[in-house]
Amino acid sequence: MPTITSYFGFLLAASTITPALFIGLSKIRLI
C-alpha cells in the first residue's frame, strides 16, 4: 500500500511541477 501511495504522490508532483517548469521556460523565451 505505501508503495502505491508514494507512486500516486510522485505522479501528482510530476503533473504539478512539469507544467510549472514549461510555463517558466515559455516566459523566459518571451522575455
Curated annotation (Swiss-Prot):
Main subcellular location: plastid
Which subcellular locations apply to this protein? Plastid, Chloroplast thylakoid membrane
Q: Name one GO molecular function term.
A: electron transporter, transferring electrons within cytochrome b6/f complex of photosystem II activity
Q: Which UniProt keywords apply?
A: Chloroplast, Electron transport, Membrane, Photosynthesis, Plastid, Thylakoid, Transmembrane, Transmembrane helix, Transport
Q: Which PANTHER family match?
A: CYTOCHROME B6-F COMPLEX SUBUNIT 6 (PTHR37266:SF1)
Question: What role is this protein assigned?
Answer: Component of the cytochrome b6-f complex, which mediates electron transfer between photosystem II (PSII) and photosystem I (PSI), cyclic electron flow around PSI, and state transitions. PetL is important for photoautotrophic growth as well as for electron transfer efficiency and stability of the cytochrome b6-f complex.
Please describe the quaternary structure of this protein.
Answer: The 4 large subunits of the cytochrome b6-f complex are cytochrome b6, subunit IV (17 kDa polypeptide, PetD), cytochrome f and the Rieske protein, while the 4 small subunits are PetG, PetL, PetM and PetN. The complex functions as a dimer.
Q: What is this protein called?
A: Cytochrome b6-f complex subunit 6
The gene coding this protein: petL
